[in-house]
Amino acid sequence: MLTAQLSRPSKSNTACRRGLIAACAMLTIAASTDTVLASSHREAPFITTVPKVDATDFYMFMSYETGRTDYVTLIANYLPLQAPYGGPNYFSLDPNALYEIHIDNNGDGKEELTFQFRFKNTLKSTALTIGDKSVPIPLIQSGVVNDPRAATLNLNETYTLDVVRGDRRSGTRASVTNATTGTATFDKPVDNIGRKTIADYPAYAAKHIYPINIPGCNLPGKVFVGQRKDPFAVNLGTIFDLVNAPVAVIADPALINAAPNTIDDKNVTTLALEIHKSCLVAGSETVIGGWTSASLRQARLVDPLPKSGHQTADKAGGAWVQVSRLGMPLVNEVVIGLPDKDKFNASKPKDDGQFLNYVTNPTLPALLSVVLNLPGAAPTNLPRNDLVTTFLTGIKGVNQPANVVPAEELRLNTAIAAVPFAQQNRLGIVGNILAKGNDNAGFPNGRRPKDDVVDVSLVAVMGGLCIANGDGNALGFGAACKPSAVPLGQTSLRLHDAVDQAVVPLLPNFPYLANPLGGTR
């Protein structure tokens, strides 16, 4: 059951004018097909040109691994749609980029903590003697790989991790270190090239899960950076072909897994942290907001005559410029209009009021009405304060900070205990409300890998919560959020994309996402 009476924030119209509603973004439909490929894969024009810094998904949840009570897991995925056979270079991250995970622990839309990842690729230039010549090999490996920094690796990828307190650029910075060795450099496993190169990839990857000491935190955490199977599930082809599916299918709960997951054969690169909640919260406030971003140097010079070596074809310099941003899933994907997608990726949560028109008057319900030939199916309770409450400020009594400033962040109440995987409702809080259950630990209270954010968002954006709210504002989503404002009626509670997130393979422990698919299987 909900832990408190749900109610929308006071002055919610003003709140709408100050922030971006993330959740109305999550309807998986779009009029343009050239920039969308999953939760946030290739979602903006510029980011399609720099896939190494393209954030695809962000997760933040209370760890449900046995023995990890009170720990928070943060996962940022980058570099989308990796083919398992994508050699010979595979998918290293960009040494000229800055990858960050931000935490807002007082609800002001600004980061108070930032975890910064920087990568370095070191080429060995392994060579073979051919006749009387020493000739470098064309591969990143020369034989079997079993351990970090194996002698057979021709390219070693390492990273450093810093924690910044305060502003991400001007705050106090300190190095996160390996709790076992005391070193500040970590090894990233090579991608899953195939079974002949790496016979037991799960065992090899597990050697790259490191215990860490975080300055200012009294309890050790964990870090893992490496390739994983893409955990997102969606029926892309059908959806972006103007939702080429009968309403009878996407409104039938018996058919929630009737369509193929079109990215089931793809990998991503994961940046994962597990940190005790006491190191993330501030004072008595138990709700934290989180998001990930990636930045590039402002200037890039391409060398017409690159020297021998690794990645010598360009030079980068100048200030960091943010080019990717992701908190709530699907926001830039399908809510922000095409002219503002690059602008959104460069923005910060505290400035989200500039995207007002995409929030209070969302286009997606109207688009769905058109492509499904259901005239007038969009909810009529404009402005959509039910969505503002649920996804922008957080739900009062669940994941709304006491002094919240509306902003597009994933919000998590660290005081709500994790629910074991088998008992998790795949529809998160929305499913919990509809089922009158006791799982308040799921999306949009954070996001777990099992949470079906596509289906949750379809229900919410098409008015399902207003059906549940009733004429008496039972759940506190606002008096205008009532059944008569929902043309689809009870059908809005049953919408889905015909791909079940709950059947995606996952691990029961950190880093939770499944091992990547190999180049040979």
Residues covered by each model-derived region:
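N-terminal secretory signal peptides that target proteins for export/translocation
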Residues: 1-16
